[in-house]
Design a protein with these regions (language model features):
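Gram-negative/organellar outer-membrane beta-barrel architecture
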Residues: 59-62, 68-354, 358-361, 378, ...
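Interfacial loop/beta elements and low-complexity acidic/Ser/Thr-rich segments
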Residues: 1-4, 22-27, 311-320
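Post-signal-peptide, soluble extracytosolic/periplasmic N-terminal scaffold domains
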Residues: 1-18
Length: 528
């Protein structure tokens, strides 16, 4: 409707929209790419991946979320999600008689032109076929006992033609059924032929030497959606093996249990004058992971038992050791049973190679002497990471991180040595050796009761996928009074945006140290 008021020269237009009846979603139908193979998971697990129930309104985000869930579970080699939507029905447009006559006349002219073009093309093909009498490949069907070439070509194409026609006919029926019922079918085709995978990564640090890490994963252990992965890491000073068994609870991605266990062997050099330590640790625990499907906070509630064995290397009088060594027990076993709760949230524009993102993590662990722990303690930890890029092609990039921790205890000397804080290395203060920074007593590194480290970095993209970096790291592991000095380093590096994630090569110097040590660090993985 339109109303025009001449004196005010204002037109008032009222528009009415008829949106029609809203379409609903059917329950997802799952199929295997090989029809002879059964579905690898029970229907309950598969249904939990769809963020809707039958009868919910159709929305693209729901179908897209299903596709993402199928990929992120890592259960399948590939998936194909198909929604059967009917073509929109265009209502007949009512026109004035003179306009309708013009359109009909135009359609007749177009039809006559098309017919004349088709006739000319057919005549050209006949002339061409009469001229083409040479044959490069002998067709045996043209000899005795064979079909005429035209009949052979037709027979050869018939199976594919029938197959295509059947699929097209089935789809047309589904589309017509969808139009009538107002319910959209969603058909998912799955392939799970390769359930086992093996990945290997490498790293290098002047302090740790070369590092090799391998991960084995079994995507589907049984029809209930259980999964298993194991990791092995080997370097000059550290060797470890750990495993994780995942059990879906309410959702394979957003609510599940993990059973974890592992063994670690680490050499700690220069702990004190003429003394090194060999630390062996065994860990066993369980946790429940709860994630918000919309990318909000992730919660982890867990229980972890840790048994450490410390063996000294070197000749030293036991009386020369600080109390922090004597009480915790060098050449002895130390244990802790920690109840933990972790809260984390990550926002980023890419999981593999983010250019913008922010991650925050908060964790609380509690242990008591009355239950398999050497000390009464509460360990509080907070961590923050950010990446921010700007400018043309996001050439300018800023990266930062901060980590803080504190051990609340009535007697720090009883806290197991391996739960205390040490810093240094490519994940904390570059330019310093791995875990070389700590409060000292009589020249012995006794470990910190507090931790505070940070980093600021600027990257410039000088070529697509390549960035030059300059950075500074700062902080330390501190005693209760924060009396030991803050250390800091500066460095430069190179970044490459590889298909497997960022690859970083850094050279850093601990300039707060009188010796100005220079260290080389090589690392693969996101900085979030």
């Amino acid at each position: 409707d339109a109303k025009i008021s001449q004196p005010e020269k204002v037109a008032e237009i009222n528009l009415k929209y008829e949106t029609g009846e809203r379409y609903e979603l059917k329950q997802v139908e799952y199929r295997m790419s090989d029809p002879t193979k059964p579905l690898p998971l029970i229907q309950k697990v598969l249904d939990s991946l769809a963020p809707w129930k039958e009868g919910d309104d159709y929305a693209f985000w729901r179908v897209n979320a299903l596709a993402n869930n199928l990929t992120n579970t890592r259960y399948f080699n590939y998936t194909l999600v198909d929604t059967i939507k009917p073509d929109p029905v265009q209502p007949t447009l009512e026109l004035a008689p003179d306009l309708q006559a013009l359109i009909d006349q135009q359609k007749i002219k177009q039809s006559q032109l098309l017919n004349s073009q088709q006739k000319a093309e057919l005549a050209r093909q006949k002339v061409t076929s009469a001229q083409e009498v040479t044959q490069d490949v002998v067709d045996e069907t043209q000899f005795s006992g064979g079909q005429p070439p035209q009949a052979y070509a037709l027979a050869r194409s018939m199976p594919l033609s029938h197959e295509h026609d059947d699929d097209e006919e089935e789809r047309q029926k589904l589309e017509e059924q969808t139009r009538i019922e107002k319910k959209i079918p969603v058909v998912v085709t799955l392939n799970a032929d390769r359930l086992n995978s093996l990945e290997t990564g490498i790293g290098y640090g002047t302090d740790t030497g070369a590092r090799v890490r391998s991960q084995y994963r079994r995507a589907i252990v049984n029809k209930y959606g259980h999964a298993f992965d194991a990791n092995i890491e080997v370097s000059q000073i550290r060797q470890s093996i750990d495993g994780r068994y995942s059990i879906p609870y309410k959702h394979p991605l957003n609510d599940y249990f993990n059973v974890v266990g592992g063994y670690e062997r680490e050499e700690r050099n220069d702990i004190g004058p003429d003394i090194n330590l060999l630390v062996e640790s065994a860990v066993l625990g369980g946790e429940r992971v709860i994630k918000n499907p919309l990318g909000d906070w992730q919660h982890i509630i867990g229980l972890r038992y840790r048994l450490d064995r410390l063996t000294k290397k070197g000749d030293i009088d036991i009386n020369e050791l600080p109390d922090a060594f004597k009480v915790s027990g060098i050449d002895s076993e130390q244990e802790s049973l920690l109840f933990g709760y972790e809260l984390s949230k990550t926002n980023s524009n890419s999981l593999l190679n983010p250019t913008k993102g922010f991650k925050q993590t908060y964790k609380l662990e509690l242990g008591t002497e009355s239950l398999l722990s050497n000390a009464n303690m509460a360990i509080l930890t907070g961590g923050w990471r950010f990446i921010y890029s700007l400018g043309e092609n996001e050439n300018h990039q800023f990266v930062g991180r901060a980590d803080t921790s504190y051990i609340f205890t009535d007697d720090f000397k009883k806290v197991p040595y391996n739960l205390r804080f040490f810093t240094g290395g490519d994940q904390s203060l570059r330019g310093f050796d791995y875990k070389s920074l700590s409060p000292e007593e009589n020249g012995f590194k006794i470990g910190g009761q507090a931790l505070g480290v940070g980093s600021l970095e600027y990257n410039y993209q000088f070529k697509d996928g390549w960035r030059a970096a300059i950075f500074s790291d700062f902080g330390n592991a501190y005693d209760k009074q924060f009396s030991n000095p803050t250390e800091y380093s500066i460095g430069v590096g190179i970044r490459w945006r590889s298909p497997i994630g960022p690859i970083r090569l850094d050279v850093a110097s601990g300039i707060s140290n009188d010796n100005n040590p220079i260290r080389l660090h090589f690392f693969i993985g996101s900085q979030l």
